[in-house]
């Protein structure tokens, strides 16, 4: 199937004409520090939702609403999720409905000393706009709304397609109420196709469609070697501290090449697209002296193989350290799952690995914390083919399919 785009030139002109105004709107959204973590000012997430709702109304959506959903934490506490924006415009008879997804919450700014600009002041440098959330994912919101503005201007507001909007407010915080939200607002969000504007570019100037995503299985590891803290000068030597044992245990998660060594985790077939090692090194900033971990193509290591990262540890800082021999150590790992795997299988495999590799007779346990299914698009389906055709028409280039 090849789609004909009869209004391509007019749509392109409309997007170009409105680009600077769209950029200004993005700048205004970036100025709102919408961090959905409880340690931050959550009223800013409300501000962000209100700003997005106003933009949705301006774009011609009907029934624009800011909604939340309740969810239950692991300890049984019922909590309310962060505000999301949903909106809709009905489809004409016989026309499909498309759901547009992005998120308006952002990551914390982190260490301000590492910023060359103010995190929440969008700063333009050449063809780049720097600011927290400028790319992830407030640009995604504006991509959707700018496209609708171009369609409204070119075809008129009654262009027959049904369009729904779902702008989440807690994606960077792990989407704790996401499943509950989908169940609560299933009818409002039902659609024939979903367009997600929240992924990485393949390369500047090259159109790309993300056709697969790895899943996630996060969990906490605890290593215990004694009943209470003791003095390292009196007992160190015959007794290893829990942090040292944790380091030994974490090292078993990978083999000598750096490939994941946990049995039972799925690996998907090699992707067709090549990702040159030189490009990965340039994109990631990895030191020249550090070899790339794992085996297989770089693309497969990124998209179709599992990956495990240590993302947190409960350990005293150097500033607060003392001559204490720690008897318990905790770490959180994030495991990315290949398409075709599932979090339940991954948590089980990780728990078995941790138990089997407990060092020096220490007690080692794994507790599941977070789960997310991997995903693979049916690339031959009409929606995916239409998206690829649209990219060819807009860019004049063959789009690539990435993970």
Q: What are these model-predicted stretches?
A:
Residues 2-132, 151-159, 333:
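Acidic/His- and Gly-rich active-site-bordering loop/insert found
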Residues 14, 21, 25-28, 51, ...:
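Generic non-transmembrane alpha-helical segments
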Residues 93-94, 203-204, 259-320, 324-328, ...:
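An extended, acidic, His-containing surface patch that forms the Zn2+-binding/catalytic region
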Residues 96-99, 128, 164, 192-194, ...:
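Structural motif
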Residues 112-124, 214-225, 389:
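Acidic-glycine-rich active-site phosphate/pyrophosphate-binding loop
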Residues 125-136, 397-402:
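Short pre-catalytic strand/loop immediately N-terminal to key active-site residues, enriched for Gly-Thr
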Residues 134-293, 297-306:
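Fold-level recognition of mixed alpha/beta catalytic cores in primary-metabolism enzymes, strongest
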Residues 218-223, 327-336:
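Oligomerization/assembly interface segments of phage tail-like spikes and tubes
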């Amino acid at each position: 199937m090849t789609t004909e785009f009869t209004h391509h030139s007019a749509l392109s002109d409309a997007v170009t004409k409105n680009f600077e105004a769209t950029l200004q709107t993005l700048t205004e959204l970036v100025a709102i520090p919408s961090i959905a973590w409880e340690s931050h000012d959550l009223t800013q997430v409300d501000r962000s939702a209100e700003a997005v709702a106003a933009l949705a109304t301006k774009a011609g959506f009907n029934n624009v609403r800011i909604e939340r959903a309740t969810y239950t934490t692991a300890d049984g506490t019922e909590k309310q999720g962060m505000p999301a924006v949903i909106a809709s415009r009905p489809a004409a008879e016989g026309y499909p409905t498309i759901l547009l997804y992005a998120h308006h919450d952002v990551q914390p700014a982190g260490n301000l000393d590492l910023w060359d600009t103010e995190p929440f002041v969008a700063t333009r440098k050449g063809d780049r706009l720097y600011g927290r959330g400028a790319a992830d994912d407030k640009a995604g919101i504006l991509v959707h709304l700018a496209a609708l503005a171009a369609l409204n201007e070119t075809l008129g507001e009654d262009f027959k397609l049904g369009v729904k909007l779902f702008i989440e407010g807690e994606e960077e915080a792990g989407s704790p109420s996401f499943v509950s939200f989908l169940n609560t607002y299933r009818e409002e969000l039902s659609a024939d196709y979903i367009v997600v504007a929240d992924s990485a570019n393949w390369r500047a100037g090259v159109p790309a469609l993300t056709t697969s995503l790895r899943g996630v299985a996060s969990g906490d590891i605890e290593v215990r070697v004694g009943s209470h803290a003791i003095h390292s000068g009196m007992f160190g030597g015959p007794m290893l501290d829990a942090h040292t044992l944790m380091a030994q245990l974490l090292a078993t998660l990978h083999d000598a090449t750096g490939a994941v060594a946990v049995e039972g985790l799925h690996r998907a077939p090699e992707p067709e697209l090549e990702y040159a090692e030189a490009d990965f090194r340039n994109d990631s900033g990895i030191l020249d002296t550090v070899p790339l971990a794992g085996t297989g193509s770089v693309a497969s290591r990124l998209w179709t193989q599992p990956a495990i990262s240590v993302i947190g540890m409960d350990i005293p800082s150097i500033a607060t350290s003392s001559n204490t021999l720690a008897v318990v150590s905790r770490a959180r790992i994030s495991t990315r799952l290949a398409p075709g795997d599932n979090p339940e299988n991954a948590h089980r495999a990780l728990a078995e690995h941790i138990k089997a590799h407990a060092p020096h007779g220490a007690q080692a346990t794994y507790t599941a914390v977070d789960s997310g299914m991997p995903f693979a698009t049916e690339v031959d389906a009409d929606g995916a083919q239409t998206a690829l055709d649209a990219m060819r028409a807009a860019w004049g280039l063959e789009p690539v399919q990435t993970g």
